[in-house]
UniProtKB/Swiss-Prot annotation:
Location within or outside the cell: Cytoplasm
Gene Ontology cellular-component terms listed: cytoplasm; plasma membrane
Residues annotated as binding ATP: G145, G147, K148, T149
Protein's name in the database: Chromosomal replication initiator protein DnaA
CDD domains linked: AAA (cd00009), Bac_DnaA_C (cd06571)
Purpose: Plays an essential role in the initiation and regulation of chromosomal replication. ATP-DnaA binds to the origin of replication (oriC) to initiate formation of the DNA replication initiation complex once per cell cycle. Binds the DnaA box (a 9 base pair repeat at the origin) and separates the double-stranded (ds)DNA. Forms a right-handed helical filament on oriC DNA; dsDNA binds to the exterior of the filament while single-stranded (ss)DNA is stabiized in the filament's interior.
One GO MF term: ATP hydrolysis activity
Gene Ontology BP terms: DNA replication initiation; regulation of DNA replication
Family: Belongs to the DnaA family.
């Protein structure tokens, strides 16, 4: 969208939604000019210093309206024309910043977003676009291997691309620097370190839980937090648990952690795990094609964290080396390849759980369900398990066949059809099916 058209649209939205007094809109907004610096940075040129002061009171309204139009967060600054031109001249005199990221850099572009992490991703983008505003500090928590470090690195990289000065440290690096300064026995060393950290516009600290019970480090840390928040500079922290569950920190530190925004990265859901597997396969350059149901199988059974996914793809690459380029990796291949790998049981809804619940109901074994015996109880248990694999897990008939002793897809379709007919004809059987389904999905 052209800048002029964007500005007109924003003004019309502001008038319509009445979040700002109409007199202010006419006096200070309509008479202003929108300048696009980049896709994530805009400056609004205001006629007077008074106008700048007034519009700054509505900065969050502008950020919200830009988000509603552009579908992404942007930074917005209000300046007079004189100040803007003065700043532009200063910027032109600066040495150019090297903004070229390495191919393997962790960025927002290569962070796979799904329902398990979309809140954290949105919050991370927001603090880059609007540092030091509402979400300060930003506290991202979740188990190891879910992408916290990737998001923190993405914040660092994007903020630096935007020309911000950023310090990123692990808690181990942070502690080591403080201890080294303290060991020198000179207070000036501590002050120098404090000054160095405070000179940044972003301070990003990974794995703050490891600062637990480090009193001297935490005293220093608390002073840093105060300086950044008081000066409108952005803090970003990560941890394996929420602030409330952190042990070994005094109450004032927990209060500080909670004073901005705490947002989780949850366990990977199957669709997100599938996207990450596909992205990693593309990145690693697997030569052979791989069928979608094979990828889904991996996502459902082995992809409880990102690091494990990289290991899975490495095994696929090695498998590919051993086979012709024309070989298409299918479900049977991956089932055989990972048969000795413990299942992560992602989301706890899987074929194994279905078989366990149904086997218990019909008093048969899982081995019997997978086998060839055709007594009434075993046949009903087998067919019902296949039916649930279809309606609950949305598995393909080929995939179901592979998971039930290597049966072909026509056998699976026949079994599912038989169960559907029984549900339609027999009310008691329908009740049994509903009861088992609720038990499987945890209702």
């Amino acid at each position: 969208m052209e800048t002029k058209a964007l500005w007109e649209k924003l003004i019309n939205k502001l008038k319509k939604e009445k979040l700002i007094d109409q007199d202010i809109i006419e006096e200070y907004i309509v008479t202003s000019e929108l300048i696009k610096i980049s896709n994530t940075e805009f400056v609004i040129l205001v006629r007077s210093n008074l106008g700048v002061t007034i519009l700054n009171e509505f900065k969050e309204v502008f950020v919200y309206e830009f988000k509603s139009v552009l579908n992404s967060y942007v930074s917005v600054d209000f300046l007079t024309k004189e100040i803007f031109e003065k700043n532009t001249k200063k910027e032109n005199k600066k040495e150019p910043i090297n903004t070229v990221l390495s191919e393997n850099a962790l960025t927002f572009e290569n962070f796979i977003v799904g329902s398990s992490n979309k809140q954290a991703n949105l919050a991370a983008k927001n603090v880059v676009a609007n540092p030091g505003m509402s979400f300060n500090p930003l506290f991202i928590y979740g188990d190891s291997g879910l992408g916290k470090t990737h998001l923190l690195q993405a914040i660092k990289n994007q903020a630096e691309l935007n020309g911000k000065k950023v310090l990123y440290l692990t808690s181990e690096e942070f502690t080591k620097r403080i201890v080294n300064a303290l060991n020198k026995g000179d207070l000036s060393e501590i002050e120098e370190l404090k000054t160095e950290i405070n000179s940044n516009e972003f301070f990003i600290l990974d794995d703050v839980q490891f600062l637990s019970k480090k009193d001297k480090t935490n005293e220093f840390f608390f002073n840093i937090i105060n300086n950044f928040t008081e000066n409108g500079k952005q803090l970003v922290f990560s941890s394996d648990k929420t602030p409330e569950l952190l042990n070994g920190f005094d109450k004032r530190m927990i209060t500080r952690f909670n004073s901005g925004l705490s947002t989780p990265i949850n366990a990977l859901d199957i669709p997100t795990a599938k996207l990450i597997i596909e992205a990693e396969i593309k990145k690693q350059g697997l030569k052979q094609k791989i069928k979608e149901d094979a990828v889904v199988y991996l996502a459902q059974n082995f992809s409880d964290d990102v690091r494990k996914i990289k290991g899975l793809v490495n095994r696929l690459l090695f498998f590919g080396i051993q086979n012709d380029l024309g070989h298409i990796i299918d479900l049977e291949d991956v089932i055989d390849l990972f048969k000795d790998t413990p299942s992560a049981n992602l989301g706890l809804l899987n074929v194994k759980k279905i078989k366990e619940v149904v086997a218990k109901k019909y008093d048969v074994t899982i081995k019997a369900i997978d086998g060839k015996a055709r007594t009434t109880a075993i046949k009903n248990a087998r067919h019902l398990s296949m039916y649930f694999a279809k309606i609950i897990l949305n598995h393909t008939s080929t995939q179901i066949g592979a998971e039930f002793g290597g049966r072909d897809h026509s056998t699976v379709l026949s079994a599912i059809s038989r169960i559907e007919k029984l549900i339609y004809k027999e009310k008691e059987f329908k009740k049994i099916v509903e009861s088992l389904k609720n038990e499987i999905i945890g209702k």
